[in-house]
């Protein structure tokens, strides 16, 4: 992102046909990997061997308006049955992150948000960037932790997460009655999104 390039997170657990469709549609210049020599015959860049600091300190000269420049490409489920690419610009990231950080009154050293979404889902932006712009931590929950049902509650307490972003169905796995059955205090905010509340 700092180089002015657009980023597309790729969930490699998706079916082969969906990954193929997204790669053919997006036509990425390179795939960032961790030690992987190649990925589907596309050029790869091993992030484990990149220098810690960039040598260049200036913006790429081809950026006309950095705020409106494409930052990320997300793929939705799409009504056609195949994922559809949706573009997010840098200004959109910043506006969303600042709005969330302000709304939740995030305080550095006191608050931490959770990341329950896949990085390939647009909701991950609000989960991560809202904390980062406020100087707060992000609690990265594994798939196993997210699916832990009632056992997720002590994890949230131990990590001191104060804002839980989650699909509503996650709340119903933690307790039969999410409206009244969650222990207090759990988080300052619970933000169900992505589907109808059960």
Whereabouts are the PLM-identified features?
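Alpha-helix capping/helix-boundary segments
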Residues: 14-15, 36-38, 145, 169-171, ...
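Conserved AMP-binding/adenylation subdomain of ANL enzymes
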Residues: 84-112, 122-162
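Conserved AMP-binding
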Residues: 11-12, 117-121, 144
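Conserved S/T- and glycine-rich ATP-binding loop of Class I adenylate-forming
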Residues: 31, 70, 76-79, 113, ...
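Conserved helix-loop-beta element of the AMP-binding
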Residues: 29, 43-54, 93, 113, ...
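Carrier-protein-dependent adenylate-forming modules in NRPS/ANL systems
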Residues: 1-94, 105, 135
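Active-site catalytic pocket residues across diverse enzymes, especially alpha/beta-hydrolases
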Residues: 104, 177-178
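Phosphate- and divalent-cation-binding pockets in alpha/beta enzyme and binding domains
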Residues: 18, 39-41, 173-176, 193
């Amino acid at each position: 992102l700092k180089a002015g390039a657009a980023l597309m997170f790729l969930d490699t657990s998706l079916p082969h046909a969906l990954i193929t469709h997204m790669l053919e549609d997006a036509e990425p210049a390179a795939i960032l990997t961790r030690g992987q020599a190649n990925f589907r015959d596309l050029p790869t860049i091993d992030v484990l061997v990149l220098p810690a600091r960039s040598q260049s300190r200036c913006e790429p000269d081809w950026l006309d308006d950095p705020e409106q420049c494409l930052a990320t490409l997300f793929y939705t489920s799409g009504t056609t049955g195949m994922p559809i690419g949706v573009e997010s610009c840098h200004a959109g990231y910043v506006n969303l992150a600042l709005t969330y950080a302000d709304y939740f009154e995030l305080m550095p050293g006191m608050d931490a948000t959770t990341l329950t979404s896949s990085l390939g889902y647009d909701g991950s932006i609000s989960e991560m960037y809202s904390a980062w712009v406020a100087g707060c931590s992000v609690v990265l929950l594994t798939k196993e932790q997210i699916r832990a049902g009632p056992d997720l509650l002590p994890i949230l307490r131990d990590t001191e997460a104060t804002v839980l972003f989650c699909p509503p169905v996650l709340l119903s796995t933690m307790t039969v009655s999410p409206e009244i059955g969650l222990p207090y205090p759990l988080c300052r905010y619970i933000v169900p999104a992505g589907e109808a509340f059960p």
